[in-house]
C-alpha cells in the first residue's frame, strides 16, 4: 500500500463487551514489532518510480539516497535490472546485517544489481533490504530495444 502512495488501515476494534479480540491483539503486536525493526522503510517514504518489470515477490519504497526493497518471499538473492543508481551500501534493515551487492553493466550499458541474502535471518513476513545510493533520487533505466 505504501509503495503505491497509500495508507494501511487496520480494521481492529472491540467486541460487543468492549474487549479487543486476542487475534487482533496478536496482529497489533506483530505489526508493532515489524515497525520497530523496519519503520524507517514506511514512515516518511514515497512510492518508488515504476520499476520497468513485473515482480511478484515484493515492492519498493524510497527516501532520499535510499531504496527499500520489501521481500514477501524467502529468496536466496534478489536480481534487479535497469538500475539507474550507484549503490554505496546494502543491508537488512531489521538488524543491520551487511549484504553483498554485485553491480554489473552489460555490453548494452544496462546496469543490474544482484543482492545475496543470508541463509539465517530474522523471520519476517516482509524482509526489508536497504540500499543506500550516491544519488538523491531513485530511478530505473528505461527498457531499450
PLM regions and their residue ranges:
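Mature catalytic domains of secreted/periplasmic carbohydrate-active enzymes
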Residues: 1-145
Amino acid at each position: 500500500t505504501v509503495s503505491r502512495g497509500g495508507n494501511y488501515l487496520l480494521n481492529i476494534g472491540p467486541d460487543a463487551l468492549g474487549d479487543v479480540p486476542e487475534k487482533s491483539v496478536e496482529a497489533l503486536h506483530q505489526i508493532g514489532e515489524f515497525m520497530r525493526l523496519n519503520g524507517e522503510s514506511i514512515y516518511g517514504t514515497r512510492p518508488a518510480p515504476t520499476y520497468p518489470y513485473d515482480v511478484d515477490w515484493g515492492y519498493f519504497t524510497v527516501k532520499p539516497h535510499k531504496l527499500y526493497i520489501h521481500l514477501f518471499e524467502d529468496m536466496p538473492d534478489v536480481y534487479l535490472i535497469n538500475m539507474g543508481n550507484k549503490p554505496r551500501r546494502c543491508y537488512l534493515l531489521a538488524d543491520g546485517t551487511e549484504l553483498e551487492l554485485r553491480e554489473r553493466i552489460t555490453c548494452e550499458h544496462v546496469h543490474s544489481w544482484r543482492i545475496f541474502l543470508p541463509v539465517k535471518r530474522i523471520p519476517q513476513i516482509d524482509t526489508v533490504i536497504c540500499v543506500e545510493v550516491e544519488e538523491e533520487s531513485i530511478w530505473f533505466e528505461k527498457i531499450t530495444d
